[in-house]
Regions:
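Short, charged, solvent-exposed linker or helix-capping segments at domain edges/interfaces
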Residues: 100-106
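Short acidic-glycine-tyrosine-enriched beta hairpin
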Residues: 53-72, 110-113, 158-179
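Hydrophobic secondary-structure block in the mid-to-C-terminal portion of proteins
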Residues: 125-183
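Conserved SET/PR-domain catalytic core that frames the SAM/AdoMet-binding pocket
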Residues: 14, 20, 28, 40, ...
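Short, charge-rich binding segments
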Residues: 31-35, 42-43, 58-61, 67-71, ...
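Glycine- and acidic-residue-biased ligand/ion/polar-headgroup-sensing regions
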Residues: 36-55, 62-64, 141-162, 166
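A short glycine-rich, His/Asp/Glu-containing loop-to-beta-strand
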Residues: 1-33, 39, 106-141
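Ligand-binding loop in jelly-roll beta-barrel domains
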Residues: 55-57, 71-100, 122, 174-183
């Protein structure tokens, strides 16, 4: 998998700390030490995972976003319960000192060629989308003095006139609205 950590902070309002695209082989466990206190978002892309933490377990399926508050120094274990299939999920950590209750919400990507908000709270908004080739959209964020991080799961995109291919991410700021085009 890939992991991206925030290095420096171009905007004071940006609290993005960690992004990871994680693959787990069949019947194995992926361990992760959390180094920053904050809100962790877990988004399975295919398969389901069992999350084991010191004081709780959770089972997270595809088409769900699970949110939990974690402290620095916490060890998380992600189990692939499938004996013959790999699983893949996204993990995003947003810095925060405010404890929030664990929650899981369902979403469905039933629209093509547009971004769909699958999670929002006072610190961040998470949008996912499926696009056909040569389709365009515009993303406008509501809060000023913030930044936007984009990551391409599969294919190629132009993100504000910058080429991104599978597994590449980009953080930009001071640009609103933002133009996206699937290639």
């Amino acid at each position: 998998g890939r992991e991206i950590r925030a290095i420096g902070n171009p905007k004071a309002a940006t609290s993005f700390e960690l992004f990871a695209d994680v693959f787990i082989n069949p019947a194995t466990v992926h361990s992760k030490w959390i180094t920053t206190t904050g809100t962790l978002l877990i988004v399975p892309l295919f398969g389901a995972i069992e999350l084991v933490q010191e004081d709780r377990d959770a089972f997270i399926h595809i088409n769900q976003v699970s949110k939990l508050w974690v402290k620095a120094g916490t060890k998380l274990q992600f189990k692939n319960i499938y004996p013959d299939h790999s699983v893949r999920f996204l993990m995003l950590l947003i810095k925060s000192d405010t404890a929030e209750p664990q929650s899981t919400v369902e979403y469905k990507l039933d629209m093509l060629n547009d971004l769909q908000e699958v999670h929002t709270d006072r610190s961040c908004s998470l949008n996912l989308g499926q696009f056909e080739g040569r389709e365009e959209t515009v993303y406008t964020y509501q809060r000023k003095d913030t930044s936007v991080f984009a990551y391409v799961l599969q294919g190629a995109f132009e993100f504000q006139n910058r080429l991104l291919e599978t597994g590449e991410g980009l953080c930009i700021w001071d640009q609103n609205p933002i133009e996206l085009e699937a290639l």
